[in-house]
Amino acid sequence: MLSFDIRSLTERAVTVDDVLPATDPVWDESDPKPSSPLRVKGRLSAAGPGQFYWHGTIEGDVSLECRRCLGDASGHVSEEAHLIFAEAGTEGVEDDPDVYLLDDRKSELDLRPALREQWLLHVPGYALCRDDCQGLCPTCGAELNVGPCDCATSAADPRWEALRKLREEKR
């Protein structure tokens, strides 16, 4: 359960040990999406009038695309999160980008959108299928991890020809 009644939070803190399924609708607009359910552990408590504080961890796997060969790559995200939620109209928080504003028409605090955002911020931006990935041939597009391609070695850029001649003359 990742949604909480705000009224109960003012009375006591809530400990959370739950999962956020990879099939949850909160991921519908996300790219990348988790490849397994996210493990969510933490504590949610009142932090003042109309304010609530979450601290905990978010952990899960992600399927990515290798930046070199465009094959499948995977990653793991394990991040500690500190989040502040505030009811709309709470003094001093309207313009703070680090505060998640709560819908004043509801008496519910839903952690899922904020946890989704925090997880996405920590997904690796550069994924490799393996450390020694050779990538794709820039000429024919063959995957060099499978084997060498049949392309001829690339001809030198003609703009560098004058420098090549100077180097040969010095020898």
What are these regions (language model features)?
Residues 1-171:
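Structured interface patches
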